[in-house]
Regions:
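Non-catalytic C-terminal accessory region of glycerolipid acyltransferases
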Residues: 163-278
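Membrane-anchoring hydrophobic helices of lipid-metabolizing enzymes
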Residues: 1-103
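Generic preference for hydrophobic
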Residues: 92, 106, 130, 237-239
């Protein structure tokens, strides 16, 4: 939507500029093209400036106690533009399975830094807040956007600190602030396989009695490689299914994690399975 609007505006401005100018013959074509490129780059710079200014006042050292409607609208506008620039052809299946009312825990396999962008873009009304590694808070603009979306940083090397993050996520769901999204492998898969899940994050669902939405994604690890070669990347995103809270009683988080793992692996296919030595 954003890129489309920018392109239309740039084209209109370019045509008007040339129509009001003194161009003739081939000069009309080259003049219009040059004006179009100039206006498009100008509009792109304005769009980036709006994002930068919006983030400039965000202080990530202060606790974020409320989800930002402004930043939700902002990412809803900008993410389709990012997907277009990166030539992502997102093929979403099973979205009708998402709970229509109430909060939930969303889990997905993790292949690329672009996975959260993909999920936010496909499910904008879900108000997803991600559990993320601490290093992501230091990324340019990204850390501030995450903060305003109530994303929670987790210390993967300290169990006590990690528990605090889990408890905060439980609190946010109980207070009906956001739904929580997490990559239960705990890290980006470097070999493309679906690695074993960390069962602790499933306690977010069992303690709050919310559904677990299982998603799988493919090919996001190839996006940057392909875009440098001007190639499109087909990105399948599947909502595999939903584990309902009625099935939780009498089961441990480990049991539920294993059920989710098995269903997601079945959807991804045998090429995502770990070697036997794992």
């Amino acid at each position: 939507m954003l890129l489309g609007s920018m392109t239309v505006l740039a084209a209109i401005f370019a045509v008007l500029t040339c129509a009001l100018g003194h161009f003739s013959g081939a000069a009309i074509v080259f003049g219009t093209l040059g004006c179009f490129v100039g206006y498009w780059l100008g509009l792109f710079a304005i769009a980036f400036a709006v994002l930068w200014v919006s983030c400039a006042t965000v202080d990530i050292s202060k606790p974020q106690e409320q989800d930002s409607k402004y930043f939700r609208r902002l990412i809803k506008l900008y993410i389709p533009a990012v997907e277009s620039l990166l030539r992502m052809d997102v093929q979403l299946e099973g979205a009708e399975q998402l709970p229509k009312d109430g909060r939930f825990l969303l889990i997905c396999n993790h292949l690329s830094i672009l996975d959260p962008v993909l999920l936010l873009g496909c499910f904008p009304e879900a108000q997803l807040a991600f559990i993320s590694k601490q290093e992501n808070a230091d990324m340019f603009l990204i850390g501030k956007i995450m903060h305003r979306l109530m994303c929670q940083l987790i210390n993967r090397e300290n169990d006590r600190e990690a528990l605090k993050t889990i408890l905060k996520c439980i609190q946010m769901i109980r207070e009906d602030q956001v739904s929580v999204a997490v990559f239960p492998e705990g890290y980006t898969s470097r070999d493309g396989k679906l690695h074993h899940f960390r069962s602790g994050v499933f306690k977010i669902a069992t303690k709050t009695q919310v559904p677990i939405v299982m998603c799988t994604v493919k090919n996001t690890q190839n996006i940057f490689h392909n875009v440098k070669r001007l190639k499109k990347t087909v990105v399948p995103l599947h909502v595999v299914g939903v584990i309902q809270p009625e099935t939780y009683p009498g089961r441990t988080a480990v049991d539920i994690a294993q059920e989710a793992y098995d269903k997601m692996l079945a959807d991804l296919g045998p090429e995502f399975a770990l070697p036997e030595e794992y």
